[in-house]
């Protein structure tokens, strides 16, 4: 009976506890049982509150965290600053400016008087124009009395067609009553052509007539271009008055010698008498 009682197990709750042994072991077993029961109860409560109870959890690709606004702002400012900086606006001198319209070009040439004016036709996408731009700015700085007008081909393409500009970079020199002095195309490698033309036409000259500017054929072509808001009326041809016409005729007669009078021969007489203008 004693052996049977020793082998018997007393059931308390749902845990089997041997009837014999130290009390410390019994207390430890009871404590572990209580802790396991408390953990199970806590897990059950959390499971009831969780929205994923009894559902499948889909795991997708990892998403990057949004960047704070204070970090994005400097990047946007740098990009905006880079877009605003244009190569043809760098290094400009006080005597350099960009033409805004056909009327602006005509007025600028007319109001320049006897000063030398250089019209620079360029394009933002032209590599030769970009390479030549720093040297043109340097030349403009060395010649403050020369006016440099820049014409953007991309913004004034229709006007350039009317002015027969089909190659870039392209330059035209104008001065006073002489109008257009020369026109040519040059690159960074042929900058000597530009310097030679500047040295030839830079010396001051006094015009005796009004400032000419563009040719009349070019003005008519600009006026006929429907894409441009430019008006021009052909100047009437001046008819010389009577005194002016007589003076012009006298000038022509003084330069040309009149041929001598031919002798006249009387027919029907035996003697042939020569009648001259002096007899």
From Swiss-Prot:
Keyword annotations: Chloroplast, Disulfide bond, Electron transport, Plastid, Redox-active center, Transit peptide, Transport
Keyword Nucleotide-binding included in the entry's annotation: no
Where is it chiefly localized? plastid
What InterPro entries does the annotation carry? Thioredoxin-like_sf (IPR036249), Thioredoxin_domain (IPR013766)
Catalytic residues, chain numbering: 126, 129
> Where in this chain does the record put each Thioredoxin domain?
61-203
The residue span given for the transit peptide is 1-34
Biological process (GO) annotations held by this record are:
cell redox homeostasis
Known function: Probable thiol-disulfide oxidoreductase that may participate in various redox reactions.
Q: Which PANTHER family match?
A: THIOREDOXIN, MITOCHONDRIAL, THIOREDOXIN-LIKE 1-1, CHLOROPLASTIC
The molecule here is called Thioredoxin-like 1-2, chloroplastic
